[in-house]
Amino acid sequence: MSVPLLKIGVVLSTMAMITNWMSQTLPSLVGLNTTRLSAASGGTLDRSTGVLPTNPEESWQVYSSAQDSEGRCICTVVAPQQTMCSRDARTKQLRQLLEKVQNMSQSIEVLDRRTQRDLQYVEKMENQMKGLESKFRQVEESHKQHLARQFKAIKAKMDELRPLIPVLEEYKADAKLVLQFKEEVQNLTSVLNELQEEIGAYDYDELQSRVSNLEERLRACMQKLACGKLTGISDPVTVKTSGSRFGSWMTDPLAPEGDNRVWYMDGYHNNRFVREYKSMVDFMNTDNFTSHRLPHPWSGTGQVVYNGSIYFNKFQSHIIIRFDLKTETILKTRSLDYAGYNNMYHYAWGGHSDIDLMVDENGLWAVYATNQNAGNIVISKLDPVSLQILQTWNTSYPKRSAGEAFIICGTLYVTNGYSGGTKVHYAYQTNASTYEYIDIPFQNKYSHISMLDYNPKDRALYAWNNGHQTLYNVTLFHVIRSDEL
């Protein structure tokens, strides 16, 4: 930055010197500083008065003067000589001087342009330096902020890890305890081996019997853990959107391992075709299915598939049919005496839903209503092979007021509606023949539920909601008493 500034200073001082020299020297070279004017002291002119230069060859001469009759002044002037040789040298000097001045002016212009260019360069460099300085400041501030953020993150991580210190201490203690248990088990194993050698075969069989008894008690405990009181229902998962507003879909809770077939029945009356999908994935993503034709049309949406057979209510009757899906033959038919049918005691949504068949951990059930029970819900436990009624419970809940119903672990749960806001608000326990009013939220996503059944294998509710096939997970509360083990 210092070199362009020195150039500017030199140019300015040079221009000042040239200006001073031209103001002092140039007039003397062209003869502008020797001109003198003289006048007579009196107010009148005479013949001997005039303005004369010192050298008669340099200027005009007043030769004589007089006054005419009218009072006008008449002067006789002698013109200078035509030869101007004495001026030629000065003219030549002036021309040379002018050329020098012009050359100097051109040099000054060139130098000025260079100076302006250097000045622009200096200004540009100055702006770049300012920008670079600003960037350095930003980088410095950003670095400080980044360090501060890293410090905060490390501090937060340390705050998170600090509570783990006592946990690690507990783990150390647990590790020591595990080692102690391992040593004790090894000692116990050696002791048992010694006892086995001493006891003999008969006592070993007795020990084996005790182990088998423990296994049976463990299985019973696991079975009891599978059942419980309903405490919550998850939000629905939409599996597929197909069919009309009414229908049913299901899987077989007693299907063997690897059998994941899905059964699909569209409509609620006067239809007899059942779709079979190979798996839930096929049901969700394709329309590849096998069609089964039932010998009679069904009524309502209360069908179930259980242990390879489909159970349904024959259209416009109170007859239940068990149909084998493999052989496509009727295995058993039975009439539910006094059960209402043909829209006599349907659910609140209608649709010939008089008889609703269900399954749970305990087997096959039928839910319906009779005149003898004043149109209130009746629960019957059925034999899945013979369809005989094993036991019946009469409730005080009106069938027409129920939106839908399902059974979990022998307890019938009833919803208060089928459209809009819905909840499970009534439960009847068949094992104690008691009921209670509950309040379990139930999200009715598509505002028209026409089928709701529990699958004990999946621990889930299957629903048909306004042409959408949905699933709900359930939460069960388990209470196991020590005397039941």
UniProtKB/Swiss-Prot annotation:
Domain notes: The protein contains a globular N-terminal tetramerization domain, a long stalk formed by the coiled coil region and a C-terminal olfactomedin-like domain. Interactions between dimers are mediated by the coiled coil region. The dimers interact mostly via the N-terminal tetramerization domain, giving rise to a V-shaped overall architecture of the tetramer.
GO biological process: atrioventricular valve formation; cardiac epithelial to mesenchymal transition; negative regulation of gene expression; neuronal signal transduction; positive regulation of apoptotic process; positive regulation of epithelial to mesenchymal transition; positive regulation of gene expression; regulation of axon extension
The UniProt record lists the keyword Glycoprotein: yes
Expressed in which tissues: Expressed in the brain (at protein level). Expressed in the brain, predominantly in the cortex and hippocampus. In the pituitary only the two A-type and in the adrenal glands only the two B-type forms were detected.
Domain Olfactomedin-like span(s) in chain numbering: 226-478
Function (record text): Contributes to the regulation of axonal growth in the embryonic and adult central nervous system by inhibiting interactions between RTN4R and LINGO1. Inhibits RTN4R-mediated axon growth cone collapse. May play an important role in regulating the production of neural crest cells by the neural tube. May be required for normal responses to olfactory stimuli.
Coiled-coil zones: 87-225
One Pfam family it belongs to: Noelin-1
Post-translational modification: In isoform 3 and isoform 4, the signal peptide is predicted to end in position 17.
Protein name: Noelin
Originating species: Rattus norvegicus
Self-association and partners: Homotetramer; disulfide-linked. Dimer of dimers, giving rise to a V-shaped homotretramer. Isoform 1 and isoform 3 interact with RTN4R. Identified in a complex with RTN4R and LINGO1. Peripherally associated with AMPAR complex. AMPAR complex consists of an inner core made of 4 pore-forming GluA/GRIA proteins (GRIA1, GRIA2, GRIA3 and GRIA4) and 4 major auxiliary subunits arranged in a twofold symmetry. One of the two pairs of distinct binding sites is occupied either by CNIH2, CNIH3 or CACNG2, CACNG3. The other harbors CACNG2, CACNG3, CACNG4, CACNG8 or GSG1L.
Compartments reported by the entry: Secreted; Synapse; Endoplasmic reticulum; Cell projection, Axon
Glycan attachment sites: N33, N103, N187, N288, N307, N394, N431, N473
InterPro entries: Noelin_dom, Olfac-like_dom, Olfactomedin-like_domain, Quino_amine_DH_bsu
One GO cellular component, as annotated: extrinsic component of postsynaptic density membrane
Disulfide topology: C227-C409
Keyword annotations from UniProtKB, A to Z: Cell projection, Coiled coil, Developmental protein, Disulfide bond, Endoplasmic reticulum, Glycoprotein, Secreted, Signal, Synapse
Stretch forming the signal peptide: 1-24
